[in-house]
């Protein structure tokens, strides 16, 4: 280094503005022919990323189609969500809509069962 210690260089960099730091990074990229972007992790063929192997614990319950028994579906929506009659009817009329978000798997399955019993289709995401 030409006259600057590491501490002096760090102090100089820490006093720069964001724009100056951005220009410094660009200049260093050009000077050394590198990129400051983080490299993407390589996935070996035949294996899936660790995130995909974890089992999902929370689900969104989405009402797909109402079927023929709209009144019974509205009743189930009210039971599951605690909504008033008008809000539940609006939700059913606007299907496909999310009925409940971030529920446990067992609860989501139970809600799905209630809807399928009255003829509605439900999707868990």
Curated annotation (Swiss-Prot):
Disulfides per UniProt: none
Pfam family, one: Ribosomal_L12_N
GO cellular component: cytosolic large ribosomal subunit
Keywords, in A-Z order: Ribonucleoprotein, Ribosomal protein
Superkingdom: Bacteria
GO molecular function: mRNA binding; structural constituent of ribosome
GO biological-process terms attached to the record: translation
Subunit structure of this chain's protein: Homodimer. Part of the ribosomal stalk of the 50S ribosomal subunit. Forms a multimeric L10(L12)X complex, where L10 forms an elongated spine to which 2 to 4 L12 dimers bind in a sequential fashion. Binds GTP-bound translation factors.
UniProt cross-references to NCBIfam families, sorted A to Z: L12
Job of this protein: Forms part of the ribosomal stalk which helps the ribosome interact with GTP-bound translation factors. Is thus essential for accurate translation.
Family: Belongs to the bacterial ribosomal protein bL12 family.
Protein known as: Large ribosomal subunit protein bL12
Gene coding for it: rplL
């Amino acid at each position: 280094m030409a006259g600057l210690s590491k501490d002096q260089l760090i102090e100089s960099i820490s006093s720069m503005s964001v724009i100056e730091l951005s220009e410094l990074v660009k200049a260093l990229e050009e000077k050394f022919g590198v990129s400051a972007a983080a490299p993407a992790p390589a996935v070996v063929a035949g294996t899936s990323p660790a995130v995909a192997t974890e089992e999902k614990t929370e689900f969104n319950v989405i009402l797909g189609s109402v079927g023929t028994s709209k009144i019974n579906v509205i009743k189930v929506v009210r039971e599951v969500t605690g909504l008033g009659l008008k809000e539940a009817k609006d939700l059913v009329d606007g299907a496909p809509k999310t009925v409940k978000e971030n529920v446990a798997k067992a609860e989501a399955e139970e809600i799905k069962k209630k809807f399928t019993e009255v003829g509605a289709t439900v999707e868990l995401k």
